Amino acid sequence: MDIGKIDIPESSGVYLMKKNNKVIYVGKAKNLKNRVSSYFNRVHESEKTNELVKNIEDIEFFLTNTEIDALLLENNLIKKYSPKYNILLKDEKTYPFIKISKEDFSSIKIVRTTKALDIKSGEYFGPYPYGAWRLKNILMKLFKIRDCNRDMKKTSPRPCLKYYMKSCTGPCVYKDIKEEYNKDVENLKQVLKGNTSKLINELTALMNKASQDMDFEKSIIYREQIKELKSIASSQIIQYERELDEDIFVFKTILDKAFICVLNMRDGKILGKSSTSIDLKNKITDNIYEAIFMSYYSKHILPKSLVLDAEYENELSVVVKALTIEDSKKKEFHFPKIKSRRKELLDMAYKNLERDIESYFSKKDTIEKGIKDLHDILGLKRFPRKIECFDISNIQGKDAVASMSVSIEGRAARKEYRKFKIRCKDTPDDFSMMREVIERRYSKLPDIEFPDVILIDGGLGQINSAGEVLKRLGKIHLSELLSLAERNEEIYKYGESIPYVLSKDMEALKIFQRVRDEAHRFGITYHRKIRSKRIISSELDKIDGIGEVRRRKLLTKFGSISAIKKASIEELKEIIPEKVALEIKNKIR
């Protein structure tokens, strides 16, 4: 990844490093530019850090008002995404984690160094920049979970002092409490994941019942537990005084575009943002604010509460009334005018919106230059604004599929992607498969819908196969036919034998690489799905009592042969007779 080409903001915030659109690391920084750049400008002592840097394909930034906001957001996003590298790198060394061991009668411990983060031996929560020991003590008091090093496989002659202090139920001695103990461990984990509401409601019901039964001692215990749980929630969720689902919605119109940024708060914690834009070209509306708001929430779930700029309160008044009447669950709309937490979050949303707008126009200029370079260097008749790219995926001709990805103005247009299951059976090879898919795609496509460029993943052989079909169909003139050979990233133009070689750091080449890689990814995913179904079907065909209907039911419920292998007899019996379930267990090893 060329970090020099990324416009990194110089403010506090959180960065999400990604590979294949999956978050692999979440970090925070007082100055994002300094922190993120430091990953790329030197060789690190830690092999894991070097490995992380090699795997970074994209970085997303989330700007915050303060470093504390960044810290809170980082913790929430780590819990949301469980990124691969977060528990392995040095960034968390100064922050303790809470570890719940994976063993009979789990223990709770504080761990501080990365060396102790062995995910096979336990589940980790954190990092906690402050209050970890207090939190652990509260949890022990609430759930009576042990924190000792005693061997739980043995029975001790007597419990330790903590049993008599009522901060442990003594599993080292009393083995018959296992079921209740495990339930307490699960409740403890839910609290650490931020899910306190359900447990508080359960304890409130128990407290009220105990009070009605005149068992005031038990009622007081429940009351104190509720107080402690609320204390945990408030220390973790300091953004708000209460738990709620809320969107902080801001937008800005520039020329013929509306840019939208929404901070998503769920259960009182900010868990991410949604950034998008709406094309306003040739659109007519009496109230642009209503149109933008309704356009966004026609595709997204409307939360219980929304925060919007006070500037738009009058313009959105009709929307507010309509949504309040239409939805049986009352919606809350907030238009903060004075300094408050909601106003701070609104400012944070605007900060991210400005960043999104800057990034959009910067990227748009870069892409536009790339499109122009492709047109000029390759001598194309049209600017390559719409590209359809084809890739073939198979293993020695088996489970062969083709995929088509689409790029419009240099950006992926995923709604237009297509996949094809190859039909030709006679000595299938990549060339004949390419001929088949090109014919299926373009034989009936109206001339007006042809793309500017048809891009083939491959070299001269593949491009000539595609050209033969388009020529026979009399449609070779409708699009530029090009191919991208993966080995040296050479670009072939139909009718020419000498390839074009572009500099690897040119946006022109990257436009083709992105759409080619998308076709490859899309095709591989489809190929694996087809192959998996075939393997499952062939395995199940060996078993008496399984026909087409039962095979389909098993596939629908379990999805893979390994999942069927792992399923218990009871789970299998839900859809097939016990005799057939036993046959599956005996024959599928």
Swiss-Prot record:
Primary role: The UvrABC repair system catalyzes the recognition and processing of DNA lesions. UvrC both incises the 5' and 3' sides of the lesion. The N-terminal half is responsible for the 3' incision and the C-terminal half is responsible for the 5' incision.
Primary subcellular site in the record, as a coarse category: cytoplasm
Compartment list: Cytoplasm
MF terms in GO: DNA binding; excinuclease ABC activity
Subunit record text: Interacts with UvrB in an incision complex.
HAMAP family: UvrC
NCBIfam families: uvrC
Entry similarity comment: Belongs to the UvrC family.
PROSITE patterns registered for this protein in UniProt: GIY_YIG, UVR, UVRC
Annotated Gene Ontology cellular component terms: cytoplasm; excinuclease repair complex
UniProt cross-references to SMART domains, sorted A to Z: GIYc
Domain named GIY-YIG: residues: 10-87
Pfam families in the cross-refs: GIY-YIG (PF01541), HHH_5 (PF14520), UVR (PF02151), UvrC_RNaseH (PF22920), UvrC_RNaseH_dom (PF08459)
Protein name as annotated: UvrABC system protein C
GO terms (BP aspect): DNA damage response; nucleotide-excision repair; SOS response
Keywords: Cytoplasm, DNA damage, DNA excision, DNA repair, Excision nuclease, SOS response
Source organism superkingdom: Bacteria
